[in-house]
Amino acid sequence: MIVLGRIVAPFGVKGWVKVHPFGDDPLSWGEMPQWWLADDADAPESAWQPVTLAGFKEHGAGLVAAFVGHDDRNAAEALQGRFIGAPREALPKPDVDEYYWGDLIGLAVVNQADEALGTVEALMSTGAHDVLQVRDGDDERLIPFVAAYVLDVDLAARTIRVDWQKDW
């Protein structure tokens, strides 16, 4: 299951909820008629419960959504804090040189000298660009996920090649 975001609060009295997205193109989720919800982002696939999308739109600087069968504020409050996910095959295909963060987690990171720098543990968004959090034992590197540093992403080989020195 790919985690897409989290329900952060109820919105209004008709069952709508505020959504905090974890990616940069959450409006594409509207193409999926069904979402999945779970209490834990790391929950096994069997713990994710499907919900049918009744509405989804931008609201101010955020997003709001409504689900079939969740028609009042009490129902929306019951969803607060739950994670939103979807199976990989339900997601829109990313464009060339675009990746779902979940596909990058666990990839090995090597530099141009073929030195192993570690494994992608997480990603974070800084506003300016995304950053790879690369773990190598007790060491952590933060590598900007931009073309100047990320030279190649090979999902099949499970590697990311970067222009980054081992001692940085």
From Swiss-Prot:
Gene Ontology MF terms: ribosome binding
Protein localization: Cytoplasm
InterPro entries assigned to the protein according to its UniProt record, in alphabetical order: PRC_barrel-like_sf, PRC_RimM, RimM, RimM_N, RimM_N_sf, Transl_B-barrel_sf
Record's keyword terms, sorted: Chaperone, Cytoplasm, Ribosome biogenesis, rRNA processing
One GO term (biological process): ribosomal small subunit biogenesis
Claim: Isomerase is one of the keywords in the record: no
Function, in words: An accessory protein needed during the final step in the assembly of 30S ribosomal subunit, possibly for assembly of the head region. Essential for efficient processing of 16S rRNA. May be needed both before and after RbfA during the maturation of 16S rRNA. It has affinity for free ribosomal 30S subunits but not for 70S ribosomes.
Comment field on protein domains: The PRC barrel domain binds ribosomal protein uS19.
Family label: Belongs to the RimM family.
Protein name: Ribosome maturation factor RimM
Organism per entry: Aromatoleum aromaticum (strain DSM 19018 / LMG 30748 / EbN1) (Azoarcus sp. (strain EbN1))
